[in-house]
Swiss-Prot record:
The keyword Metal-binding appears for this protein: yes
One Gene Ontology term from the biological process aspect of the record: L-arabinose catabolic process to xylulose 5-phosphate
Pfam families reported in the protein's UniProt record: AraA_central, AraA_N, Arabinose_Iso_C
Catalytic activity: beta-L-arabinopyranose = L-ribulose
Protein name listed in UniProt: L-arabinose isomerase
Coiled coil ranges: none
UniProt organism field: Lactiplantibacillus plantarum (strain ATCC BAA-793 / NCIMB 8826 / WCFS1) (Lactobacillus plantarum)
Matches recorded under SUPFAM superfamilies: FucI/AraA C-terminal domain-like (SSF50443), FucI/AraA N-terminal and middle domains (SSF53743)
Amino acid sequence: MLSVPDYEFWFVTGSQHLYGEEQLKSVAKDAQDIADKLNASGKLPYKVVFKDVMTTAESITNFMKEVNYNDKVAGVITWMHTFSPAKNWIRGTELLQKPLLHLATQYLNNIPYADIDFDYMNLNQSAHGDREYAYINARLQKHNKIVYGYWGDEDVQEQIARWEDVAVAYNESFKVKVARFGDTMRNVAVTEGDKVEAQIKMGWTVDYYGIGDLVEEINKVSDADVDKEYADLESRYEMVQGDNDADTYKHSVRVQLAQYLGIKRFLERGGYTAFTTNFEDLWGMEQLPGLASQLLIRDGYGFGAEGDWKTAALGRVMKIMSHNKQTAFMEDYTLDLRHGHEAILGSHMLEVDPSIASDKPRVEVHPLDIGGKDDPARLVFTGSEGEAIDVTVADFRDGFKMISYAVDANKPEAETPNLPVAKQLWTPKMGLKKGALEWMQAGGGHHTMLSFSLTEEQMEDYATMVGMTKAFLK
């Protein structure tokens, strides 16, 4: 399984020396208490570390520099306990190269009417301190996240948690490396894109390799290594021989397992975290990678079919963000246009992620007309029910655009005995007709990432962080 470093977030609160040392000690004590209780809540995926009370431009600037150069730190969380003159934040905020969350909160969640005096008022000035601070971020066009509300409330903690996942994905985005095995499908438009701009904006490195390089690695895989993977497959999934004889079935599965290990070793050696295949580029391969691709996707690798490196990179980012939970490569395949039944049946030839399965996936072997190779093994399953999002990235002359809408996912209304692939049914929440029209008008492609565990807000936050144009359809 691809791992993500154990990041942390540094938390600072703003104030000024005007209030005196005793008040500043109280500010630090309260901020430390907030950090401790956020960590103890069990809601946050990454630790919050309180660093200091920021009172001068010099200290803020030095702090932001330290954040930039500490690889363990994924971002900054700020809070204005008292009034903090925002000119002090200008230089440091301009220098900050990592995600910024402004937590607009207050240490206590009430007004102590019976006891309140001006000492209390001076100490608890978040109401206008946060506005002063928010102004300078808006003036600097920092496009930071603001979470508003009482820090001890579950909904606020959940917002912070979701943002932490996005911020970590942003940091990891600059480590995303896509290995393209073969080129994009010939004459297809939407899978093309500016790889240099993708590396500048999102940090995605995209490299091409000829199929011969990959075949050489696959051929090195030993029978003993395949035996181990076969046993693991038997322990995880249902092995369905179907109409195949035993030897044919087992050989087909073993070919895919050799591909899985060969591709994985190739990716590991080059530090790649995503990959693409293309059924038009299969020189020297017995089968189109089906089960092989699904197992790699299961392990956290991003994937794009037909050379679609943008979806492969997006998939890796979303898998980081979702902790590799219920987030799958998908393609709009066929439609139900009957009134009252409007839906999209999503699938792909072979490569849908088993993380969205509602039943135990079955390892099956069936013919595949496309590609001109032997019958490939694949995982067959039905997707899940619930709320999800469908997301794609397209490249236009003026830059990249993220297009997304919320969907209601369902299971097919009937069995599909002649369709031995993984499949997922869904309908845009805005309606199929309106959703499809607006998707096409925005230039959204047919390859997407479908996620049951991420929110549109998270994807919008990521798009904002990397400076991507957004078309979130409502």
